[in-house]
A protein has these predicted regions:
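N-terminal helix-loop segment corresponding to the beta1-alpha1 unit
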Residues: 1-135, 162-166
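Short, acidic/polar N-cap/turn motifs at the starts of alpha helices
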Residues: 7-8, 139-141, 178-181
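Short acidic/polar mixed-charge low-complexity motifs
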Residues: 16, 138, 187-189
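Short linear motifs in exposed loops
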Residues: 21, 96, 143-145, 192-193
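Glycine-rich beta-alpha junction loops
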Residues: 68-70, 146-152, 186, 194-196
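Substrate-binding/catalytic subdomain of NAD(P)-dependent oxidoreductase enzymes
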Residues: 129-169
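Alpha-helical interface/anchor segments and their boundary "cap" residues
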Residues: 161-196
Length: 196
């Protein structure tokens, strides 16, 4: 952590880290309950951590693959930044929610929100699956697509389209004030009042 960024340190505070020696990978797998990786299917196979190999070492293992677009389909080998995932998942089109200007291009939300939200949900899924695996002895491969997750949490965008066939737009009408982009002398500034 000494040579890492403040962002990395904040995300990993209180965690123990280790360096994996590929010669001892099998020992580590046999000790683990959950293996988490972010590799595409081909890369996972090249590194020897694809689900088939891991289950041959420990059938009750939970393998969580958090990838940009999932492990199947035409984008399975694609990598993506948070910017790409926000756009591919549809979130960028709703941002900023404070603007009703249709000419404003899609924008990225601050930080790595897509990856952070998806990671929290993926961790919950992995823990629930590990609990089940401990009871049944059956391991499971979890194919977690960040893009699919982002698309699933677009406020009411998905149900609105599903039931009304209406495409969601930026929702600039807010009851809490201020929640708006204000034009200051040196440029726009966004002010949000999320507490009453």
């Amino acid at each position: 952590i000494d040579d890492s960024s403040g962002y990395f340190a904040a995300l990993n505070i209180g965690k123990r880290s280790c360096t994996v020696d590929s010669d001892n990978l099998e020992q580590l797998i046999c000790w683990a309950d959950i293996v988490v990786h972010d590799l595409s299917p081909l890369m996972a196979a090249e590194k020897g951590i694809d689900a088939i190999r891991l289950f041959s070492l420990k059938p009750e293992l939970v393998v969580l693959a958090i990838t940009a677009f999932g492990s199947e389909g035409p984008e399975a080998e694609f990598r993506a930044t948070d910017l790409i995932l926000g756009a591919a998942g549809g979130w960028s089109m709703l941002c900023p929610a404070t603007s009703s200007d249709p000419a404003l291009p899609p924008l990225k939300v601050y930080g790595d929100q897509c990856y952070l939200m998806a990671s929290i949900s993926a961790a919950a899924v992995a823990l629930a699956t590990a609990r089940d695996a401990a009871d049944t002895g059956d391991g499971e491969f979890i194919d977690f697509s960040v893009q699919a997750y982002v698309a699933s949490v677009l406020e009411s965008a998905l149900p609105t389209y599903t039931y009304k066939q209406e495409v969601a737009t930026r929702r600039h009408e807010r009851r809490l004030i201020p929640w708006k982009i204000f034009h200051a002398i040196d440029g726009p500034v966004f002010v949000a009042c999320v507490e009453q």
